[in-house]
Curated annotation (Swiss-Prot):
Residues engaged in binding Mg(2+): S21
Keywords: Cytoplasm, Elongation factor, GTP-binding, Hydrolase, Magnesium, Metal-binding, Nucleotide-binding, Protein biosynthesis
Major place of residence: cytoplasm
Lineage: Archaea, Methanobacteriati, Thermoplasmatota, Thermoplasmata, Thermoplasmatales
Protein name stated in the entry: Elongation factor 1-alpha
Length: 424
């Protein structure tokens, strides 16, 4: 039986090499989720490969390719319990070209740990900003900042360096709209302040990282909204049948339900539901599930389709109006521009058909009607036409399916939310 404690999806974000995977490995190890002999095995292997401090990180970096490169590519999920919560940990990649995965991952998070290295010359960096901003735009409501590598400051465990990094991070996070933020000085590699108070930082009187996680609030589950499950993957399992996998964003799914997948437009009956290999009689928002559907073949549906009930089907649009912020475009964006929109698990090329107006980012008032173009830092209302059918919802109705990121040339050029739509 799955744990009776409230369940939170927790993502670790931050700049590459600031120690996210090592911290996650440490958390899981100290919770007994990983036996000591496995860590010892990883330590020997890491030493042989010339990556002596990587053993904890390798817990999450399951893929061989990641071990060789020392970077996290796909999203790895692991679970652990605290006194108060049952957490599924999502370790998000830090390298630039992996921001896409980070986007699809962040939209599943109830809370985030932002990892920032306190080592000299590290601190708040470009990727720290981008990840924090994406977390905000994609609706991650609460965050704890782990100021990591305190063992590597000069002198080690320097209160002065902690306060510098904390001040920079606080300024950044407040400017993008985070309110409740706690800061914890830690060493993921040495274990300081992760689950136990550190004797090396007597100047710090606050909670350990674990206590800070337990101070998170449980987001109210949107169980009264229509069912929406964006499909992450589809399996065909011998003797069972077609099994889509995804996270319930809104609503409730039970065995026996009649469901429809859109835009694929395929219907079926739910036979059974599983989470972490255990059967569920009811799946609720936040649950990462696999569910067996009768009447649908594996090739009928794919990643990016959304499952809903027949009487309240997901909304397929032919056009939508969005509020976007331009984050990182090398020149300007004009009508006719066609990047890829990442909405829940879907990735669809969309044309920016019209720039309706630009807004003042501080108060949302109109700056200019129908400008010719928009550039970095601009907030704008735009009309968007997808190349092919796409499920997206108004952010005012189902925010979980109303937010998106815009990618082009290997980077996130903009992020935004759907404020109005034209049904197909």
């Amino acid at each position: 039986m799955a744990s009776q404690k409230p369940h939170l999806n927790l993502i670790t974000i931050g700049h590459v090499d600031h120690g996210k995977s090592t911290l996650v490995g440490r958390l899981l190890y100290e919770h007994g989720e990983i036996p000591a002999h496995i860590i010892e095995e990883y330590r020997k292997e890491a030493e042989q490969k010339g990556k002596a401090t990587f053993e904890f990180a390798w817990v999450m970096d399951r893929f061989k390719e990641e071990r060789e490169r020392g970077v996290t590519i796909d999203l790895a999920h692991r679970k652990f319990e605290t006194d108060k919560y049952y957490f599924t940990l999502i370790d998000a990649p830090g390298h630039r070209d992996f921001v896409k995965n980070m986007i699809t991952g962040t939209s599943q998070a109830d809370a985030a740990i932002l990892v920032i290295s306190a080592r000299e010359g590290e601190g708040v960096m470009e990727q720290t900003r981008e990840h924090a901003f994406l977390a905000r735009t994609l609706g991650v409501p609460q965050m704890v900042v782990a100021i990591n590598k305190m063992d590597a400051t000069s002198p080690p465990y320097s209160e002065k360096r902690y306060n510098e990094v904390k001040a920079d991070a606080e300024k950044l996070l407040r400017s993008i709209g985070f309110k409740d933020i706690s800061f914890v000085p830690i060493s993921g590699y040495k274990g300081d302040n992760v689950t136990k108070p550190s004797p090396n930082m007597p100047w710090y009187k606050g909670p350990t990282l674990l206590q800070a996680l337990d101070a998170f609030k449980v987001p109210e589950k949107p169980i009264n909204k229509p069912l929406r499950i964006p499909v992450e993957d589809v399996y065909s399992i011998t003797g069972i049948g077609t099994v889509p996998v995804g996270r319930v964003e809104t609503g409730v799914l039970k065995p026996g339900d009649k469901v429809i997948f859109l835009p694929a437009d395929k219907q079926g009956d739910v036979k059974s539901i599983e989470m972490h290999h255990e059967p569920l009689q009811q799946a609720e928002p936040g649950d990462n599930i696999g569910f067996n559907v009768r009447g649908i073949a594996k090739n009928d549906i794919k990643r990016g389709d959304v499952c809903g009930h027949l009487d309240t089907p997901p909304t397929v649009v032919k056009a939508f109006t969005a509020q976007i912020i331009v984050l990182n475009h090398p020149s300007v964006i004009a009508p006719g521009y066609k990047p890829v929109f990442h909405v829940h698990t879907a990735q669809v090329a969309c044309r920016i058909d019209e720039i309706v107006k630009t807004l003042n980012p501080k108060d949302g008032t109109t700056l200019k009607e129908k400008p010719d173009f928009i550039k970095n830092g601009d907030v704008a209302i735009v009309k968007v036409i997808p190349d092919k059918p796409l499920v997206i919802e108004k952010v005012s109705e189902i925010p979980q399916l109303g937010r998106f990121a815009v990618r082009d040339m290997g980077q996130t050029v903009a992020a935004g939310q759907c404020i109005d739509l034209e049904k197909r």
